[in-house]
């Protein structure tokens, strides 16, 4: 028999997991205090659900002091559908810690202030709302999808933050932004990059060497 697996991090170990919740909370506090939005380009499957998990904790622990009732918009039909699949397939999609929450009647991906934008009209309305907010949208590398509209509306604002939570491949719009581009082209327009650019270091959906070997040993 043969087993074919991915091995992106097969030659290394991830090390201690950073405190992503506190990092995100810091970004939210800093940005909301200036009246801006936090725009998060996010992969629709896996990464968006992980961000929702973190954001639920931030809300529950009231970690955003001056704006605790902030709204979170998920603006990606695929991400919304994937989230529904996660919720319907608990045993396959969640780890033991998350299953414990579910057993207590807590949905780890739901919280007050979460808004799901399915239609194009709902998507457009997000940027007409001037209240500080979190916008989760795909694609994660900003090459396509609704995220490009949110970048167009927020990149030029010095009080907003673009928070990257995934790998940005060479040649992508996301890579250009994190490498310090001062302008980018969106929908035929040159958009100045004035927003604060942040990244979550070390976050990955790929298992490291230990995790890959553990998975193989269980077969």
Residue positions per predicted region:
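Acidic/His-rich, metal-assisted hydrolase cores and their charged scaffolds
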Residues: 1-219
């Amino acid at each position: 028999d043969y087993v074919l697996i991915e091995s992106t991090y097969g030659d290394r170990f991830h090390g201690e997991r950073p405190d992503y919740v506190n990092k995100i909370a810091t970004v939210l506090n800093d940005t909301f205090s200036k009246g801006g939005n936090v725009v998060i380009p996010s992969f629709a499957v896996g990464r968006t659900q992980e961000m929702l998990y973190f954001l639920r904790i931030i809300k529950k622990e009231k970690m955003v002091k001056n704006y605790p009732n902030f709204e979170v918009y998920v603006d990606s039909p695929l991400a919304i559908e994937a989230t529904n699949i996660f919720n319907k397939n608990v045993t396959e999609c969640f780890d033991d810690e998350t299953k414990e929450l579910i057993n207590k009647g807590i949905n780890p991906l739901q919280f007050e202030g979460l808004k799901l934008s399915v239609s194009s009209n709902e998507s457009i309305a997000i940027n007409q709302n001037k209240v500080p907010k979190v916008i989760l949208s795909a694609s994660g590398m900003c090459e396509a999808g609704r995220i490009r509209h949110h970048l167009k509306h927020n990149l030029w604002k010095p009080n907003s933050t673009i928070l990257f939570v995934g790998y940005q491949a060479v040649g992508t719009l996301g890579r250009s932004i994190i490498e310090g581009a001062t302008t980018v082209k969106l929908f035929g327009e040159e958009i100045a990059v004035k927003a604060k650019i942040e990244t979550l270091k070390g976050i990955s959906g790929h298992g490291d060497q230990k995790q890959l070997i553990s998975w193989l040993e269980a077969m």
